[in-house]
Amino acid sequence: MLQVYLVRHGETQWNAERRIQGQSDSPLTAKGEQQAMQVGERARSLSITHIISSDLGRTKRTAEIIAQACGCDITFDSRLRELDMGVLEKRQIDSLTEEEEGWRRQLVNGTQDGRIPGGESMQELSDRVHAALASCLELPQGSRPLLVSHGIALGCLVSTILGLPAWAERRLRLRNCSISRIDYQESQWLASGWVVETAGDVSHLDAPALDELQR
């Protein structure tokens, strides 16, 4: 059985400003760096052998902090990038026009052909993150990889493993530096292939997440 751990990047400046990131970037906040350190402390006990990260700055920094803690090398994979949010990237959510908010809500509310102008669809996102995950099956026997990616990307990955369409309503919360685990196995009691063991674990973090504070 192959165990793969999934980690969302630490809190960023634009997360705190309620600004849409997508494939644009902003640095980790001090809290985000601390969150990544706490993931690293947890990762030391998980026997992680490989760290594979999105090549965007916020995930690279998160991966670097985790790698320092568990002594692993990092591989960067652009297929783990966040959903391309097109013309809405860098915009504050509260500044969107009614039309722009409608584009964004399509992705949240489950519109099959939803796409922000200039961006990508949820199906396109799903195809590439699943391809990145499939590459883990080529790692040496006994490997235990940890993937560092993004909220929408990882939410789409976990949801589609559970059998939902890529464009389904977003109902899975994966907070900054949450840890999820998926396993590849042959089972008499579960469908063969990828299964979800845990999703969105934040028990290793010692402070409330942004979405808890901004309610």
From Swiss-Prot:
Keywords: Glycolysis, Isomerase. GO terms for molecular function: phosphatase activity; phosphoglycerate mutase activity. InterPro entries: His_Pase_superF_clade-1, His_PPase_superfam, PG/BPGM_mutase_AS, PGM_Phosphatase, Phosphoglycerate_mutase_GpmB. It comes from the Bacteria. Its EC number is 5.4.2.-. The record marks H150 as: Transition state stabilizer. The active site is at H9 (tele-phosphohistidine intermediate), E82 (proton donor/acceptor). Pathway: Carbohydrate degradation; glycolysis; pyruvate from D-glyceraldehyde 3-phosphate: step 3/5. Substrate binds at residues 8-15, 21-22, 58, 60, 82-85, 104-105, 151-152. This is Probable phosphoglycerate mutase GpmB. The lineage of its organism: Bacteria, Pseudomonadati, Pseudomonadota, Gammaproteobacteria, Enterobacterales. The gene is gpmB.
